[in-house]
Structures are given as C-alpha cells and as structure tokens.
Amino acid sequence: MSEVMALNALSQQVVQLKQGELLEVSDIYDSLQPLNNGLGGKLLSGWLSLSQHLQEAEHHLDQFSERRPLCFNRQSNPRADRFEGLVTRRFATSVQREINRLEQATRKVMPAMGKLERSLATGQTPALTAFQTERDQLIDNTRALLVHHVQRLGDTLGTCGLRPGYRSYPRAEPNSLGSFTPQ
C-alpha cells in the first residue's frame, strides 16, 4: 500500500530533520504525493459515511419496530421473512463487504499514521490534537454503533426465531466487529 510506505518515509524524514540533517524539499514533496492522492481522506469519509448510514438504519429500525412487533410468540411470518431476506441480502452480504474493506484499510494505515504523529509530538498544535481526537472518536464510535446495530438486527429477528443469514448459517453469531460469522 503506497500510503503506508509514504507515511513511513515521511516519519523517517521527520526523524532526519530532528537530527539536524538537511533534506531536499522535493524529497519531502515526493513522500507527500501518494498521501495527496491516497487513502487517508477516503478512510475518514468512509467512516463518516458509515456512521451516517448506521444512524439512518437505526432510525428506520426504530420506525419499523414502533409500528408493530415483527412476530408474536417467536413465530415467523411473511413480513419477518422479507425483513430477514432484506437484512441478509443488503447488510450481511454487500454492506458487510464494504465495512470489512474499510476496516482492513484502516488497520493498514493507522499504525503508520500513529508512528508519524508520535514523531511530530513535540511540535503538535492544539488543532492537530483536536483533529486526532475527533478522528479516533469517529472510528471508535462508528465501530460501537455497528456492533450495536448488528445486535439489534439479531435481537429483532430473534423475536421470530430468525437471524441474518439464518437459513445459510443456522448458528451465525455477531463477532466483536459487528459482522456475522458462521459457527
């Protein structure tokens, strides 16, 4: 991943500058170029978009539940079957793939970002500290919202004896990241 290599190169250049070495501006610019075109902003916009979509999905789930219970006496019905199909088709298959890509990219980039940020700690401004805090809270809060939403979907379908992916994986349970994994 070119962004990780760029962050590592930039970290090394910061160390060199702190040690008093002279660097060519063009070398620093070359290190920044992959970041300018790369993943960093896309990751943050991905987490923000996911957070907004999850909040919207929570709102729809609230509205869906307020109208009437999905099932009575844990008995499935056509409405519950349609809901389970929707959850399985949209969330457990397509949306979950996108979430996994976002999570993997974040896990690749953030260690290099952390290394770079630690190397800049002595010259860190309050604005940068606030940005880092806000960024980390966005990611952490969105992860927590995802786990909560998946649990709610499971609980809602559980009132009918169903779960997302139930027909494919009868013992699927949500994992710590909010994805359903077969057991």
Predicted regions and their residues:
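Acidic/His-rich structured neighborhood in mature extracellular/periplasmic domains
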Residues: 1-54
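A cross-kingdom marker for long, charged
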Residues: 38-183
